[in-house]
């Protein structure tokens, strides 16, 4: 039985709706907690994308409201975040979806002779 991924079914790719910045933040947090500046630096190194503070903190707020990340106790003036178990599960589903679409796209390019 196929799962309708548009209606909240198990395995739904909830990250399709939150944007690239949110996905990059989850990927960055997958190897451990980070505060805002560390996230900006890691994402720039990882993906060549420099998130501005408004984009970063807007995405952090959305991810926290969705329960995909959580804040940790502040260290001095820094406020670290970590990925939650539901956040890690959502990231896995999203990355699996990207891999399937990427493989299909590559196959179609090959079959099309492009």
What are these regions (language model features)?
Residues 1-15:
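Short, Lys/Arg-enriched N-terminal segment that forms or immediately precedes the first helix
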Residues 56-58, 62-63:
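Basic amphipathic alpha-helical segments that dock to polyanions
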Residues 6, 92-114:
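Amphipathic alpha-helical dimerization/coiled-coil segments
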Residues 64-75, 82:
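Beta-hairpin "wing" of winged helix-turn-helix
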Residues 28-31, 72, 90, 94-97:
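Histidine kinase transmitter module recognition
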Residues 76-95:
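Basic, amphipathic "hinge/linker" alpha-helix immediately C-terminal to the N-terminal HTH DNA-binding motif
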Residues 12-55, 75:
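N-terminal helix-turn-helix DNA-binding core of bacterial DNA-binding proteins
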Residues 31-35, 62, 87:
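Short, charged/polar surface micro-motifs in flexible loops or helix N-caps
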